[in-house]
Design a protein with these regions (language model features):
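Phosphate/oxyanion-binding active-site loops and adjacent basic polyanion-contact surfaces
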Residues: 19-23
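S-adenosylmethionine/decaboxylated-SAM
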Residues: 2-18, 28-213
């Protein structure tokens, strides 16, 4: 199986977010591989937004008969805030005036039939990681693009990935003209330079690595 199909694919593509179709399929394939190498271990997504990528990831986790923990504070990244390029006013909670993607995420999971597979974890990624005790088959980092945020996400979660497990990183751009450098320098290069991770695939801005030691 190389791609998400049927109604779930339609739901994913209808969901607000930044995951291109071909990269979603690559994420799906990577998660299936992680579940095969590390059977029974849960998976983690950092930065779920409205759940677009989570449909691909969660569908794979369901096939692997495991759980996906979707970690997000649901207040949006820096670039999603009012006045920034990627701000979406339809995601603002009128009662608070603040961005709140949680209701949209929960609706997406319900529509996709993934509420039994995807566990919604609302909070700061490093804080959640600090109390995490179990190895994971895969970690997909798609959080904020500020350098400290990206570095903290990697530092917090890379050690929880099991040997043979997968680290996937979104928005990896080697050329600064194409996008921010934090995911590339603070996560991808940090992983490669650690000697603990080796490249598996590159699809668009999605990089997939496996833990080798």
């Amino acid at each position: 199986m190389t791609e998400l199909s049927g109604e779930r694919r339609t739901i994913a593509l209808e969901t607000t977010g930044f995951m291109p179709e071909v990269e979603g399929d690559a994420l799906f394939v990577a998660a299936l591989a992680a579940g095969k190498v590390c059977p029974g271990l849960p998976m983690v997504e950092i930065g779920s937004y409205c759940g677009r990528s989570t449909v691909w990831f969660g569908a794979a986790a369901q096939i692997c008969n495991t759980l996906l923990f979707a970690v997000d504070h649901h207040g949006g990244s820096e670039e999603n805030q009012i006045g920034w390029e990627w701000h979406d006013p339809t995601l603002v909670d009128e009662s608070t005036g603040q961005l709140n993607t949680l209701p949209h995420f929960e609706k997406t999971m319900s529509r996709a039939g993934l509420t039994e597979t995807v566990r919604t974890v609302v909070g700061d990624s490093p804080t959640i990681a600090s109390t995490w005790t179990q190895e994971i088959a895969m970690c997909f980092i798609d959080g904020g693009h500020a350098r400290d945020v990206a570095a903290n996400d990697y530092a917090a979660w890379n050690g929880h990935i099991a040997l043979g497990g997968i680290l996937a990183i979104h928005d990896v751009f080697t050329d600064p003209a194409l996008g921010g450098q934090a995911p590339y320098e603070e996560i991808y290069l940090a992983a490669k330079n650690s000697g603990k991770f080796a490249d598996v695939s590159a699809t668009g801005s999605l990089r997939v690595l496996t833990r080798v030691k």
